[in-house]
């Protein structure tokens, strides 16, 4: 193999894209990963890091451009870590995400008879985030800065706009930056673990336009809070709720456990099709409401509900998917390990007048065995776990339960593929549909249908 050393300048043709969107050039089968390089491009690049099994390169010049390359519309794209694919046409982004799923399920796991559908995309793949989490800091000139982190760092890129956030959120961000400066509010400095203001979080109801503004502070004492609230309401009279969240943990976790309502309601309301949901500052709620409706509609299609089925909604959160399915089912049982989420789910069931739902707090693998002992046998099980996927104990419990169908929603196809191999003992993976919940990024969500053999 050719010698490869740091700072070498080389040329080559990009032959593949990684799941992180990096171009792959190979030298005698040795891969070099190059951010922002695209398949079939002939490029010049510099080796910046060499490892045992791969190297990292920096793109210097593009000698032959891909037909899928586009000019990134965001002026911060080269520095900000929020997006990874703005230089790739949206049609090619959707195809890349489908290829990622094909690679996981067919090429690696050999689910050769399982159908992989086209990625479900957006008509307008911008301004889709209904929640913004914006770090606050100071620059070298001691000026207040707000924006998003540089890739793989905690260096804040001071930004005036973000093309994937709700446009109202950037208006709030810019106003808050001015308010913090004018009122001389103490700013948290991560390295020193001193200062007050840590993050600004903004949540918006996609269909209702209700807005919640949350200030995350390093401690409860905040002398200027009344003045800040007054200025926010002067600038944005449509704000429904203003809250202070207290996080003095000095960790990477954005929000703490205690929140104080400074103005308005404790929650905001949003709708998904015909269902209404209360959302608190801490609630898990899908970031992209438009795509969530498409995702849930596909899940209902897979569930094949006629009104006579018992549905078990595991990892149910605030009850979004369970309540979405309730009008089409005989009864929905939801289980979630987070107590506050179950409280939200029960309130959401009341709001939606769903009398055919039961929500219980506990570990799914334990609660479903209790339900089994009570004679409750689900026809369909909904699974929507966090990125780490399902606990193996839960999978084994599910296999003993033997529902007719399992509908598995995942925000991490890699762990979904791992779990699919365990489910294959008794279930046939019929098909997988990728859904583009986060355009311009490498993330892809999937919904899969498993039928009992």
From Swiss-Prot:
SUPFAM superfamilies according to UniProt: Nucleic acid-binding proteins (SSF50249), S-adenosyl-L-methionine-dependent methyltransferases (SSF53335)
One function term, GO molecular function aspect: metal ion binding
EC number: 2.1.1.-
Pfam families, sorted: tRNA_U5-meth_tr (PF05958)
Residues annotated as binding [4Fe-4S] cluster: 74, 80, 83, 162
Active site per UniProt: 411 (nucleophile)
Binding sites annotated in the UniProt record for S-adenosyl-L-methionine: 286, 315, 336, 384
Any one GO biological process: rRNA base methylation
Keyword terms: 4Fe-4S, Iron, Iron-sulfur, Metal-binding, Methyltransferase, S-adenosyl-L-methionine, Transferase
EC primary class: transferase
Family (UniProt): Belongs to the class I-like SAM-binding methyltransferase superfamily. RNA M5U methyltransferase family.
NCBIfam families in the cross-refs: rumA
Protein name per the record: Uncharacterized RNA methyltransferase SAR1988
Species name: Staphylococcus aureus (strain MRSA252)
